[in-house]
């Protein structure tokens, strides 16, 4: 494992800890769910293929569910589709050459517009699974749609800040 991968794993560990703090101590109301985990899944090193990335995402989600006051398996179930789509999203928004060379996913190569688009799709995919599973048929479609929209906006802002931080770690600590 090279130094670059260790830095990325450390950043993912910090994101999981931050998500635990958010889940346990920061309540934004019934309409907002702040999640950082889809962005962490995008930063899993590309040497891990889809199956390994899905397993890592599942374990991250299960750890957050287990150590927070959430439903066990909820984050895990919502993160697995994000990990499944990770390679496709990186190929689509960052480029095939990044996947072939197994470079770290940072803002430096694709630019902010493509990075925000990739993070946006990952967060939306996560929320489209998470919110219906969390409501379990108890909430109306309108409430769930509002929750997805508000959670998307909040999580996207946090995800952009997080990707800037990971880019700084990878770029300046090497």
Residue ranges: model-predicted function:
Residues 1-174:
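Terminal, non-globular segments
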């Amino acid at each position: 494992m090279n130094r670059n991968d260790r830095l990325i794993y450390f950043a993912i560990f910090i994101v999981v800890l931050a998500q635990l703090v958010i889940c346990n101590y920061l309540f934004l109301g019934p309409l907002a769910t702040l999640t950082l985990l889809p962005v962490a899944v995008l930063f899993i090193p590309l040497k891990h293929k889809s199956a390994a990335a899905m397993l890592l995402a599942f374990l991250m989600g299960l750890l957050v569910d287990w150590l927070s006051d959430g439903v066990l398996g909820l984050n895990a179930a919502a993160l697995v589709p994000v990990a499944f789509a990770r390679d496709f999203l990186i190929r689509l928004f960052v480029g095939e050459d990044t996947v072939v060379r197994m470079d770290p996913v940072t803002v430096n190569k694709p630019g902010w517009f493509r990075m925000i688009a990739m993070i946006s799709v990952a967060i939306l995919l996560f929320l489209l699974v998470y919110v219906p599973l969390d409501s379990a048929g108890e909430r109306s479609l309108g409430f769930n749609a509002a929750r997805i929209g508000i959670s998307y906006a909040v999580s996207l802002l946090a995800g952009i800040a997080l990707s800037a931080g990971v880019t700084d770690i990878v770029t300046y600590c090497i």
